[in-house]
């Protein structure tokens, strides 16, 4: 009887310690996404700076591409912007922007001021497209394959290390290089 009184708290402690150990070993930048391995959500939206033009992910079928979620008010987006500019100049894969929860005109002005790495950037003022993609915040980047399937999701600013070690090798693999 006395033995059971001591074993129960010990067992509870070991279970809690196990969950804690698993949690501490996870990368906080890698938020789980149920969309990995699934077709990217379809949408049709006006483009930043050219509302008469409309973009849909179905236009990218047959290409490996990046979807980068950004906003003019996002400080981290400014941090990653030089990396996106460099990546776009290398023409490794087309980059599509998703201007998330911004005011009309702010995104276009921001791109004019800082440079435009996107083949097109769509306007998502209410964040509905972002919700469909499970966006937690900005910036976020998705790698989407030739069939429109999401292969990678990265929350946070893109770094040179991330481009060199994960994104570019994945794109080359998906392109059969």
Task: Spell out what each predicted region is.
Residues 43-66:
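A short beta-strand-turn-helix
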Residues 78-115, 125-131:
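Structural microenvironment flanking redox-active thiols in thiol-disulfide oxidoreductases
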Residues 39, 63-65, 69-73, 137:
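Short pre-active-site segment immediately N-terminal to redox-active cysteine/selenocysteine motifs
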Residues 25-27, 46-52, 121-124:
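Short gly/ser/thr-rich secondary-structure transition/capping motifs
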Residues 42, 92-93, 118-119:
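A generic structural signal for alpha->beta connector loops
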Residues 6, 112-117, 124-175:
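Thiol/disulfide oxidoreductase modules built on the thioredoxin-like
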Residues 1-46, 177:
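N-terminal targeting signals for export/organelle localization
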Residues 66-68, 97, 143:
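Hydrophobic beta-strand core positions in alpha/beta domains
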């Amino acid at each position: 009887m006395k033995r059971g009184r001591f074993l129960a708290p010990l067992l509870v402690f070991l279970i809690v310690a196990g969950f804690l150990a698993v949690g501490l070993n996870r990368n906080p930048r890698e938020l789980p996404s149920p969309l990995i391995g699934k077709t990217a959500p379809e949408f049709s939206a006006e483009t930043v700076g050219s509302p008469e033009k409309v973009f849909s992910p179905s236009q990218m079928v047959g290409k490996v591409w990046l979807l980068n979620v950004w906003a003019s008010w996002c400080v981290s987006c400014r941090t990653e912007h030089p990396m996106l500019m460099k990546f776009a100049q290398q023409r490794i894969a087309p980059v599509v922007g998703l201007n998330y929860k911004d005011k009309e005109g702010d995104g276009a002005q921001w791109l004019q001021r800082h440079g435009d790495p996107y083949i097109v950037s769509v306007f998502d003022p209410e964040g509905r497209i972002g919700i469909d993609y499970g966006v937690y915040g900005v910036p976020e980047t998705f790698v989407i394959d030739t069939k429109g399937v999401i292969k990678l999701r990265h929350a946070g600013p893109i770094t040179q290390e991330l481009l060199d070690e994960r994104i570019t090798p994945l794109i080359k693999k998906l392109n059969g290089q």
